[in-house]
């Protein structure tokens, strides 16, 4: 027993000694700007001689748990401020005042050479937008800031679908400009170009954007002929805390497109948290709701010459309005004119009667001999009544075409179907919901693994060769990455689902065919035109009468019949309907090693 009592105090002494050596200190404090006395966020705090560290939050506060014994030295550094060292001898809160510095070209970018490079040392022009710029901008969204950069052109298809480009080359859906979000190609696989800011980062999670005007194919692939846009998210180790943002505004205040102004609402939130500078996560969402602008140009357009014409539906029978859909269907594109269509109808009827009578009856020659050039209705009725019953109906249908050709009153003109305006065919209510999140784990002080996901869905409008209404479209990007100081390996996938997206032009054309086929509509138009001309109407009045006659039965926009036909056609896949089917995906694995380091 005596021996046991001697060892027990020794064991206790060793236990408390070891415990004292492994004690954890929590160092905390506040960082301010010495001149303005404002809090400084995102300041890097590192224990000198080690890789342990943390970052200050939005209020300039920081906390750092360490097992290193006191005293120790903390190194404070941030872009725009002089680096400062502070010796810590106790666990009390400290207040650090950073001295602002203005050194041209000190900002670090990663765009020009895919490695960290100072702006003044970069061999190419770089346009950069920081988180502070985004926070202070009056623009509707951070993506709109890109349109204000030097040398940038932009095509706006809708509020959430904007296509930037550089060097004077631009069009809607630009396949010549790369857009990378955290290193992932942000293009929609089925479209081969980025869908603006429809999917990707929420506004509160954007750390910076970098634009390389001009060719960057050697660095970022063949899609970068006209430039590359890099959008980088915030590091959850560096930017922690809960953030919430609400933007509200109004548009259409001039009431030129709508009877009353519309609301623009943008809600977003972000939450990030780090644990012992080892594990961190972040989640975020953004919801945008607005009344989009309506494409309402009714100018006449010639698709062959690609020129705007000085005409309208009242003056041009072959009218094709820019934002009027369905009127693209016309006689000319089917290889016909009003006159050739009349000749076709007469020729088919004539040949049919010749075949039926064994070549005994040439109805055209018979009518030439039996009827005057301008007969009365009574004369026409008597002639048809004298024919065999089997011939009466086809001859009755041929009569207006025959007399139109005989009297040379049918022009070599084309006529188009009557279309519907965009507000009848496209839902102008914008909806965009984005959800993002990531998990980060530092395997060692120089090796980090991360799992990231971005998802976007909603309604928007895209203008290409036609006008597309993207309803319920969904795009998701998911990435697994292993990154060190001098190398990285990443694999990611992009999953695209077009949802109920449809082509407004094809939908309108198919809707017209559904209520009356063009094979019926065009002959009715020509026949009614001849009748109107025979009664003394001029060409303009005859065209108006012909359209009114051929459009009998046309469903009015907004009517129950229209809605039923519209829903049926837009949900039928192209080419039978207007539904744009797209279930594409992209898989990518890439790596990089910097031999310089």
Where are these predicted regions, by residue range?
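Short acidic/polar hinge/loop motifs at secondary-structure boundaries
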Residues: 62-65, 185-213, 269
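Short, surface-exposed beta-strand/beta-hairpin micro-motifs centered on an aromatic residue
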Residues: 59-66, 93-94
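Outer-membrane beta-barrel translocator/receptor signature
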Residues: 204-207, 218-230, 235-303, 431-433
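Extracytoplasmic beta-strand/coil segments of soluble accessory domains associated
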Residues: 63-65, 126, 143-188, 207-208
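Short, acidic, small-residue-rich periplasmic hinge/interaction motif at the N-terminus
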Residues: 30-36, 43-48, 73-81, 89-135
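N-terminal periplasmic accessory domains that precede
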Residues: 92-97, 142-145, 162-168, 177-182, ...
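Outer-membrane beta-barrel domain signature, strongest for Gram-negative TonB-dependent receptors
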Residues: 310-597
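Short, acidic Ser/Thr/Gly-rich low-complexity loop/linker segments typical of extracellular
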Residues: 51-61
């Amino acid at each position: 027993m005596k021996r046991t009592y001697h060892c027990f105090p020794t064991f206790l002494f060793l236990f408390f000694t070891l415990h004292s050596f492994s004690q954890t200190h929590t160092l905390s404090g506040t960082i301010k700007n010495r001149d303005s006395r404002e809090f400084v966020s995102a300041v890097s705090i590192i224990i000198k001689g080690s890789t342990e560290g943390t970052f200050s939050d939005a209020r300039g506060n920081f906390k750092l748990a360490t097992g290193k014994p006191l005293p120790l030295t903390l190194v404070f550094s941030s872009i725009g401020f002089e680096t400062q060292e502070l010796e810590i001898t106790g666990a009390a809160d400290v207040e650090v005042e950073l001295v602002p510095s203005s050194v041209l070209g000190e900002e670090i970018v990663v765009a020009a050479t895919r490695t960290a490079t100072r702006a003044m040392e970069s061999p190419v022009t770089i346009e950069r937008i920081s988180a502070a710029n985004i926070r202070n901008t009056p623009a509707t969204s951070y993506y709109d800031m890109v349109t204000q950069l030097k040398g940038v052109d932009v095509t706006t298809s809708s509020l959430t679908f904007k296509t930037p480009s550089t060097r004077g080359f631009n069009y809607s859906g630009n396949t010549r400009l790369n857009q990378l979000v955290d290193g992932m190609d942000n293009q929609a696989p089925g479209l081969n170009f980025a869908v603006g800011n429809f999917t990707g980062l929420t506004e509160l999670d954007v750390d910076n954007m970098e634009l390389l005007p001009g060719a960057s194919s050697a660095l970022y692939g063949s899609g970068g002929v006209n430039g590359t846009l890099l959008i980088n998210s915030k590091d959850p180790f560096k930017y922690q805390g809960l953030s919430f943002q609400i933007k509200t505004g109004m548009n259409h205040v001039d009431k030129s497109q709508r009877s009353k102004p519309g609301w623009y609402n943008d809600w977003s939130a972000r939450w990030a948290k780090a644990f012992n500078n080892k594990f961190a996560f972040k989640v975020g969402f953004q919801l945008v709701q607005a009344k989009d602008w309506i494409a309402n140009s009714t100018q006449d357009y010639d698709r062959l010459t690609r020129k705007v014409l000085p005409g309208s539906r009242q003056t041009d029978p072959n009218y094709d309005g820019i934002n009027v859909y369905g009127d693209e269907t016309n006689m000319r594109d089917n290889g016909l004119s009003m006159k050739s269509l009349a000749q076709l109808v007469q020729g088919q009827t004539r040949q049919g009667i010749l075949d039926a009578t064994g070549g005994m009856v040439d109805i055209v020659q018979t009518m030439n001999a039996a009827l005057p050039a301008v007969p009365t209705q009574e004369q026409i009725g008597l002639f048809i009544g004298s024919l065999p019953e089997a011939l009466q109906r086809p001859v009755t249908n041929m009569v207006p075409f025959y007399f139109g050709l005989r009297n040379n009153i049918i022009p070599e003109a084309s006529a188009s179907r009557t279309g519907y305006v965009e507000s009848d065919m496209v839902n102008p209510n914008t909806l965009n919901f984005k959800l993002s999140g990531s998990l980060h784990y530092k395997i060692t002080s120089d090796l980090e693994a991360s799992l990231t996901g971005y998802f976007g869905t909603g309604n928007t409008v895209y203008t290409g060769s036609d006008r597309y209404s993207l309803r319920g479209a969904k795009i998701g990007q998911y990435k697994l990455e292993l990154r060190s100081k001098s190398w990285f390996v990443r694999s990611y996938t992009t999953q695209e689902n077009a949802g109920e997206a449809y082509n407004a032009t094809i939908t309108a054309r198919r809707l017209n065919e559904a209520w009356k086929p063009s094979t019926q509509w065009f002959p009715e138009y020509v026949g009614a035109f001849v009748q109107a001309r025979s009664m003394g109407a001029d060409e303009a009045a005859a065209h108006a009468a012909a359209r009114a006659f051929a459009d009998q039965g046309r469903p009015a926009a907004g009517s129950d019949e229209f809605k039923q036909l519209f829903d049926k056609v837009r949900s039928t896949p192209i080419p039978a309907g207007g539904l744009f089917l797209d279930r594409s995906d992209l898989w990518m694995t890439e790596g990089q090693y910097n031999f310089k380091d």
